[in-house]
Regions:
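Extended alpha-helical scaffold and adjacent linker segments that couple domains
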Residues: 1-76, 80-649
């Protein structure tokens, strides 16, 4: 199957989109903008169509709805919709070209348009600026808030259909809330003027208001604005303002925006349909194999609307859309630009659909964008990618000869960017979700499953909660255990090993030997040999060879009483296993039963204990003893018996 890099043509600058360069200024942009060129790069969302329908009906004198409130976070497309409405209201011919099917589209001519951006603070306040734009600069000669009568008089004198837009007002209210006036603040005066303006618009037949809020930002200013809106709407009889959401990030229309803004051309519909069918076959195979749930087949149905992006892209982005500072539509557009850069210029040129797994962490722009959304630098550098090439995912991919670990980790990273704490916050993906999203024609799921299991065991910042895997700023249990193991005192590790050897080879039947000595001084060994047959366990670090160990014991007559158990191989593995057990035991001392990672710790401790036992028996596999006067050696039975005494016997 051909990649999207082969089938699609990008617009100029599609790989270098920056949030700051996309910010629109309503007051500046509606003057002198080429409407046709503007709409050539605009995708008509449901929110835009709804806004235009309501505005046109009101401006044509055919609706009692006097305005709308655009609700979405910063960067959610509110200003863009206002700009669309302004251009269409002022240009009858453009209206007919762009949205010919809207009712009443031909029922009025060019509307008067006034726009105010709340990040500006003109000396005559917002009401003076609106009056100036309507051609009546002297309508409000004082700084007192106009009452509804004064506003109605302004609208009447301006004449004709009238569109008034107020964008980003919470910062405006917030600033004036710091300016005292009488028993309150200037913001109280502005709030009164704002309410009066909305009430006047309701009572003026062809006046339509568009106002925007900033959800999740400027809390104090938003409270003033919302209070003014409630005062204007709550007349007990009529609903004056409707709410419109510019873009639904969870739906498919965001893909229409991305396609329109980033791509010059896409392949024909029949090619896209073929891609969808190929993905369907791959998903069906996964369902039959029990790797995927039947719901995964829905992705194939969505590809025609989301191509060249995977349907999961907006679903994962929706997890962090409410992050403070993430500018929703603008932010997602920049994020998609970084994804395409990973495909066109990075390591993911084979992508048949652009998904979160294709972000290339070696690109500085990708790392910077992820850092802007949520600072997970530690997770990225330790677990996924760093310039030294020793992040866990990099090591796994080098060993396995594919990029599945990095790609799985990048998908989990994108799903982990939500920062708002609370019961509603969801981070991460369940393993079956990840397998669903990485399933593609010619891409087996098995390598991803194996890579994910290794990441779960080795990554320092990968956590699990309610079956979902996610990266966090805080190190996980793996990291804590690694630190304990790394800093374990050598003397304590030696003592742990001694205790385990004494336990493993303890003589219950006493048929082969009567007692065990481990890492003891030569004089103690000789004293024990004078009494009974002894299994003496020696550490290679104490004597380089069994013969050297015998020489260290010196001369003793009871040579037939000696069985020397010597570690012949794997001492490094044994030390590592002992350190893991030490770390797990130490962590268990600090965790109570109610700790969220207690069950995981107990499972690890059991596994580490079992691995240590196996390492002990595999290492100490060489039994040396005297047969007559000859010092001989016997390899112990390693057929799986865990009882050391039975192995020696």
């Amino acid at each position: 199957m051909k990649s999207i890099k082969e089938l699609c043509e990008l617009r100029d600058g599609a790989l270098e989109v920056r949030v700051g360069e996309q910010i629109e200024n309503l007051e500046e942009d509606i003057r002198g903008t080429d409407g046709r060129a503007f709409f050539a790069g605009t995708y008509v969302t449901r929110g835009l169509e709804e806004l235009v329908r309501k505005a046109v009906a009101r401006l044509a004198g055919q609706s009692s709805c006097a305005g709308v409130v655009l609700k979405q976070a910063l960067g959610g497309g509110k200003t863009h919709l206002m700009k669309c409405a302004a251009l269409l209201a002022a240009d009858p011919e453009l209206r007919r070209e762009v949205m010919p099917g809207v009712p009443h589209i031909n029922d009025f001519g060019a509307a008067r348009v006034a726009a105010f951006n709340g990040r500006n603070r003109p000396p005559g306040f917002f009401w003076g600026e609106i009056a100036r734009q309507l051609g009546l600069p002297n309508a409000f000669t004082t700084l007192e808030a106009p009452d509804s009568g004064a506003w109605k008089n302004l609208f009447r004198r301006a004449g004709g259909p009238l569109l008034v837009m107020l964008d980003e007002m919470p910062p405006y209210f917030e600033y004036y809330a710091t300016q005292p006036s009488g028993n309150g603040t200037v913001a109280d005066i502005i709030s009164n003027a704002y309410t009066n303006m909305l009430v006047a618009a309701r009572e003026t037949g062809q006046a339509f208001m568009i106002v925007s809020t900033l959800e999740g930002a400027h809390a104090r200013g938003s409270r003033f604005m919302n209070h003014a809106l409630r005062d204007a709407v709550n007349d007990g009889e009529r609903r004056m303002l409707d709410s419109v959401t510019p873009v639904e990030l969870e739906g498919n229309e965001i893909y229409g925006i991305l396609r329109r803004r980033l791509f010059r051309s896409l392949p024909p519909e029949e090619v896209i349909a073929g891609v969808a069918e190929d993905f369907r076959r791959s998903l069906e195979e996964g369902v039959k194999a029990g790797v995927l749930d039947a719901a995964a087949l829905q992705d194939a149905d969505s590809i025609r609307q989301t191509y060249p992006f995977h349907p999961s892209f907006s679903k994962i982005a929706a997890l962090f859309k409410d992050n403070e500072g993430f500018q929703q539509t603008r932010g997602l557009l920049e994020l998609a630009s970084r994804l395409l850069k990973s495909i066109w210029q990075g390591s993911s040129g084979d992508a048949c659909l652009a998904g979160a797994q294709h972000f290339d962490p070696s690109l500085a722009d990708v790392r910077d964008k992820f850092r802007d959304i949520a600072r997970l630098d530690g997770a990225l550098a330790r677990d996924i990618w760093n310039e030294q090439g020793d992040a866990f995912a990099q090591e796994l991919d080098r060993r396995n000869g594919h990029a599945c670990a990095t790609r799985a980790a990048m998908m989990l990273m994108m799903s982990s960017l939500a920062e708002n704490a609370g019961a509603e916050t969801v981070r991460g993906l369940a393993p079956r979700e990840l397998f669903r999203y990485v399933t593609a024609p010619g891409a087996a799921v098995a390598p991803f499953r194996e890579a994910l299991e290794e990441l779960r065991g080795r990554a320092w910042y990968l956590h699990e909660e309610d079956g979902r895997l996610y990266f966090d700023r805080n190190e996980n249990l793996t990291s804590k255990l690694a630190s304990y193991a790394r800093n374990a005192p050598a003397a304590r590790i030696r003592e742990l090993l001694r205790e385990r050897l004494l336990e493993t080879f303890a003589p219950a039947e006493k048929l082969a030997y009567a007692s065990v000595l481990c890492f003891e001084a030569p004089d103690r060994v000789r004293a024990a040999l004078a009494r009974e047959r002894v299994l003496y366990i020696a550490m290679p670090g104490d004597a380089p060879t069994p013969e050297a160990c015998m020489r260290a014991l010196g001369d003793f007559p009871e040579k037939n009483n000696l069985l020397l158990l010597y570690g012949s191989r794997g001492m490094g593995n044994l030390d590592e296993a002992a350190r893991r057990v030490y770390a797990a035991r130490r962590a268990a001392q600090t965790m109570g039963n109610g700790h969220p990672q207690y069950a995981e710790l107990q499972e690890r401790l059991n596994n580490d204990e079992h691995s240590w036992n196996a390492a002990v028996l595999a290492t100490f596999d060489s039994l040396h003893y005297f047969h007559g006067s000859r010092f001989t050696v016997k390899k112990l039975d390693t057929s799986g018996k865990d009882n050391g005494e039975i192995r020696v016997r």
